[in-house]
Amino acid sequence: MNRAEVQSWFKNYGSWVIAVFHLVGILLLGGPWSPDFVMLTPLNLLLLSVVYLITSDKVNRPLLYALPVLMGFLVEMLGTNTGFPFGEYSYSSVLGPGLLGTPFLIGVLWWVLLRSFNDVFSRISSNKTLISLATGLGMLLLDIFIEPVAIGLGFWEWQSAEVPLENYIAWFVLSFVFARLTMNGQVKNPMSKWVLIVQGGFFIVMGILRQ
């Protein structure tokens, strides 16, 4: 298969691929046996990222398109080493290798989610500021569902007993800023809505199962 055929296949079936892998993730991580399988999490996130990259339309400004990877990683590295702007927290080894206590995959996850929200809202409005605000709100809402599950699975831990309010404020503000700064690098991707549906569904279901 050539590149065009591979992209066509994933555009047609990529949503099923990521849905099946996340369903398997729920089965493996939703029970008492989850400690035996949680270290497979990076493979699932990597698959999600690769599928999203393959299904993206032609990228005319690749550096701007990929910039959220670096932005997300650097701000997380700042956060884990200084406590600013999210609060005092630290990552475990579950999300794979990293630098200065920050997994490399966390920057990739910022990119996938930010680009997905940006793409979805770009289909509704042409106002870049409104799109960026909606992206920030979407990222904030998703993080609310992610936090209890990620903490329970040992992805990261907070020094405080509860997730600090500044985490959510920073998540929204940074998502808005990153979306606005990189808006001109956005491209359409048929997988965007499925990334959000699957990721949202995964963390909602996992949150229910782990209560």
Where are these regions (language model features)?
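Aromatic-rich, lipid-facing transmembrane alpha helices and their immediate juxtamembrane interface loops
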Residues: 1-211
